[in-house]
């Protein structure tokens, strides 16, 4: 387990046994059937548990429903035809009227129309898939697939990368992660993140072996000069690499100052590594620690707000060659922090919008490589 700070650990998760069994049961498959996947021959149960992501459905699978719920001649639910066996061989063009017996038993929402509307609306498809797995959809549409058909549609299990939260020099032979466990209920069933649930339920609780690998970084690294100051922004589990950075900086004994920005919803419940951080502060290893608790007051406060509050000092650090690091959510947080840096350059650097953008995005990030990001 040789690694450096800034690297990530790849974790190869497995599907929850109860979801695998539900899928087998609803399709009427034989769990012990020998099948062949991209990883060789094994039982169907093992294939579903280890080779394919069955905890969440994908767009390709929903699109396949069109062939399952639509009859050969026109858009009629397979369910309806099965209820009216006398007309199961009836065929017609879309413009032809339906037989009376089919009209009577038609549900309020035609499954084929629902599939078509989902396939035509990207946002609707995303919303639909966000809260459903294959079991949900199979129950909703009452469709059957062979294992081989399902393998062609289901996505393969992909490893998840987690920023390493420890220094190898401080913890030889060990690697530590900071993981937010995702669990929730929807449509009457318990759900969660594939890898986070797997680690929470299996590691330390069973003899389960976990597949892992190192994912080295080439760019998200500490300055070669140990006396260089650094600013770290890592809200939530984004603090992970900066715990490693701090352990390494303490181990190396350089004179560079360390400033950590951290935040989450509440100080009472999400103050990760509180004792460790307080120890760094007491020992003088952490020069400054700035927090942003978004729900501990009426007004929501995030790390980008704290950055702008300390804009003058941050700009002074930049002028003195400090490195700036950010880790965490790329959709909102990273963009807001990026904008805050541009505004700091405008307000405290006396730059125009164009010059400030060039300084942050070109000079610091690309030329000097002292604005570094690990976002996801």
Residue ranges and their predicted role:
Residues 1-376:
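FNR-like FAD-binding dehydrogenase module
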């Amino acid at each position: 387990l040789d690694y450096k700070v800034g690297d990530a650990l790849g974790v190869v998760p497995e599907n929850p046994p109860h979801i695998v069994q539900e899928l087998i049961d609803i399709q009427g498959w034989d769990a012990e059937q020998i099948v062949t996947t991209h990883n060789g021959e094994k039982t169907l149960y093992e294939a579903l548990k280890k080779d394919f992501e069955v905890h969440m459905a994908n767009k390709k699978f929903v699109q396949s429903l069109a062939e399952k719920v639509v009859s050969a001649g026109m858009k009629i639910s397979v369910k309806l035809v099965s209820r009216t066996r006398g007309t199961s061989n009836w065929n017609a063009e879309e413009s032809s009227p339906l037989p009376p017996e089919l009209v009577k038993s038609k549900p309020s929402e035609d499954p084929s129309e629902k599939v078509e509307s989902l396939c035509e609306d990207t946002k609707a498809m995303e919303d639909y898939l966000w809260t459903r797995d294959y079991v949900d959809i199979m129950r909703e549409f009452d469709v059957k697939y062979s294992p081989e058909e399902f393998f062609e549609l289901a996505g393969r299990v992909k490893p998840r990368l987690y920023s390493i939260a420890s220094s190898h020099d401080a913890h030889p032979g060990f690697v530590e992660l900071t993981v937010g466990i995702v669990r929730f209920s929807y449509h009457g069933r318990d759900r969660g993140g594939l890898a986070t649930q797997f680690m929470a339920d299996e590691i330390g609780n069973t003899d389960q072996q976990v597949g892992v690998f190192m994912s080295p970084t080439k760019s998200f690294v500490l300055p070669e000069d140990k006396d260089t100051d650094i600013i770290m922004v890592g809200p939530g589990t984004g603090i992970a690499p900066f715990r490693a950075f701090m352990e390494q900086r303490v181990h190396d004994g350089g004179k560079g100052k360390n400033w950590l920005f951290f935040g989450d919803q509440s100080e009472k419940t999400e103050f990760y590594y509180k004792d460790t951080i307080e120890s760094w502060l007491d020992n003088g290893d952490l020069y400054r620690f700035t927090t942003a608790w978004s729900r501990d007051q009426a007004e929501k406060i995030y790390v980008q707000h704290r950055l702008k509050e300390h804009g003058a000092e941050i700009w002074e650090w930049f002028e003195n060659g400090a490195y700036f690091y950010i880790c965490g959510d790329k959709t909102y947080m990273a963009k807001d922090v990026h904008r805050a840096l541009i505004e700091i350059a405008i307000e405290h650097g006396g730059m125009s919008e164009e010059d400030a953008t060039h300084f942050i995005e070109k000079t610091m990030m690309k030329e000097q490589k002292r604005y570094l990001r690990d976002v996801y």
